[in-house]
Amino acid sequence: MNVLDEIVLNTKSKLEVMKSKTSLEELISQATKLKIEKSNFKASLASKDQAIIAEIKKASPSAGIIIEDFDPVTKAKEYESFGASALSILTEEDYFLGSTKYLKDVKKIT
């Protein structure tokens, strides 16, 4: 089994556990209560001659920890100053050491 297969298998297992704890109806109910401003991803990419999607991640299965003193907000600001059109923020916890908190933190400054 390669790493990608392992990640998929692990993620499916975690999703099954989560689904057993919270119903789809409850998730939909929670999501509809959130006040999330929508962005236009396609327009962000189309607005420039060369669009760059910058990736924010602490680690990867192949490289291990990439940034020891990782701060997703600092990285987002850095990428923005370099002209990134959009951000890809890894939230997968086991292999990329991500967190959904990264999304919330970066959303506050973008």
Residues of each region from the PLM?
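Alpha/beta enzyme core
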Residues: 68-90, 109
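Residue-level signature of catalytic and energy-coupling elements of molecular machines
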Residues: 7, 54, 79
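Hydrophobic faces of well-ordered beta-strands that scaffold small-molecule active sites
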Residues: 52-56, 87-89
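Active-site-proximal loop/turn and secondary-structure-junction residues that shape catalytic pockets
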Residues: 58-60, 91-95
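Active-site mouth loops of central-metabolism enzymes
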Residues: 56-71
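N-terminal positively charged helical leader segments and presequences
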Residues: 1-49
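Alpha-helix-loop-beta-strand connector modules within alpha/beta enzyme cores
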Residues: 36-53, 97-110
